[in-house]
Regions:
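Beta-propeller domains
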Residues: 78-87
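Short loop/turn segments that connect beta-strands within beta-propeller blades
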Residues: 86-89, 126-130, 166-170, 206-210, ...
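Extracytoplasmic beta-rich repeat domains
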Residues: 9-12, 42-67, 94-109, 118, ...
Length: 373
């Protein structure tokens, strides 16, 4: 008799880290609605008067994503609060106030949330109640989204150090020598972390002790989270270049320059590359989302948005979803770059969507967090 087949694996029921996991390559789950994009609910946060900007600064999850589990959405806001909302209707479950804006994606690990912000602290919060378990002080702002592996928390700081803390009590396990200010996040593959710096370096670090395995020159400030794919490391920088390096030794394989754009940003890239099926997908300040071949960096297609693209574009079930600085959310076909649906939801979307069960969670600069389908 035929052996009974094991039940099919359940799709993941959470997006717990920035870009899904420590390797930054789980982008979410469908299924997608057959209808055009529509707002299911929105939640309004408060603003903060402009310490970084002349205008009052609002907005959520810049430049990260919310994190989402089976029932709740967690995100940090420019108003200095960490929020937990009911994913179904956007109602407030709890809020935790810090001393300054929060930019990074909160990391969900078990019953804990790891959050970090511009007040120099890393916070460990009980995700069910919103109460503080511990906090750890760094030397400067922490925009980098953390990752937790085997009860160790890893993150890079704008103070130039890469840190490893104990999840239980926040005790320091190690911090590296000063590498350069890290505003972007990192990805983990094969026991190593890959992270770019403001100085224009790409580091490959040994996670066990933080030692440098190799360093490659990008040559410009990089806020991108590197993507590791089939023995190569992909990243981008504010000079408008997308780079591909050898994962083993950091040798440059190719680079591609996005052209055009206006203002001081021109074609600069703040987004992170999404590498799937032999293709690299990334948006630029010139308003285009590019699809490049992963092996040679040649353009497959490009899509013109309504404004600059600073957020990253997760790819789920054949669709890329991303916002632009004109306030539009776009859903396009990853196959050929053709628009499926777009909707103006806010003013200035710097953030990246989290996608779970075909629902899209994204923050905008108007201080609102949106759920769309």
């Amino acid at each position: 008799a035929a052996k009974p087949q094991p039940p099919p694996p359940k799709p993941p029921s959470s997006v717990p880290f920035w870009l899904g996991n420590a390797s930054r390559n789980f982008y979410g789950t469908g299924p997608w609605s057959k209808d055009p994009l529509q707002v299911v609910w929105s939640f309004e946060t408060k603003g903060i008067s402009g310490r970084l900007h002349k205008d009052p600064w609002g907005g959520s999850s810049w430049p990260g994503q919310p994190s989402v589990d089976e029932k709740h959405v967690y995100f940090g806001s420019a108003d200095g609060r960490l929020y937990c909302l009911d994913a179904k209707d956007g109602s407030l479950v709890w809020t935790y106030k810090t001393e300054d804006s929060l930019k990074a994606t909160p990391t969900i690990v078990g019953d804990r949330l790891i959050a970090s912000g511009l007040d120099h602290y890393i916070y460990c919060i009980d995700k069910n109640t919103g109460t503080l378990l511990w906090k750890y002080q760094t030397g400067f702002e922490v925009d980098c989204s953390s990752a937790v592996i085997d009860n160790r928390i890893y993150f890079g700081g704008e103070d130039g150090y890469f840190y490893c803390l104990n999840l239980e009590d926040g005790a320091l396990i190690y911090k590296t020598e000063r590498l350069g200010s890290m505003e972007g996040s990192f990805s983990v593959a094969d026991g190593r972390a890959y992270i770019g710096t403001e100085r224009g370096d790409l580091f490959c670090l040994n996670l066990a002790d933080g030692s440098t395995v190799w360093k490659a020159l990008i040559g410009a400030d990089s806020d991108s989270t590197p993507a590791v794919y089939e023995g190569k490391v992909y990243t981008a920088a504010e000079n408008g270049y997308v780079y591909c390096f050898n994962q083993t030794d950091g040798q440059l394989i190719w680079k591609y320059k996005a052209e055009g754009g206006t203002g001081k940003e021109k074609s600069g890239i703040w987004a992170s590359p999404i590498v799937v099926n032999g293709r690299v997908h990334i948006g630029s300040s010139n308003g285009y989302l590019y699809c490049l071949t992963a092996d040679k960096g040649e353009v497959v297609w490009k899509y013109q948005a309504k404004g600059m693209i600073w957020g990253t574009s997760p790819l789920v079930d054949g669709r890329l979803v991303f916002g632009d600085k004109a306030g539009w959310l776009h859903s396009i076909s990853a196959d050929d770059g053709k628009e499926i649906s777009s909707l103006k939801i806010g003013d200035n979307i710097n953030a990246t969507p989290a996608i779970l069960g075909g629902r899209i969670y994204i923050g905008a600069f108007n201080g609102k967090l949106y759920c769309l389908k």
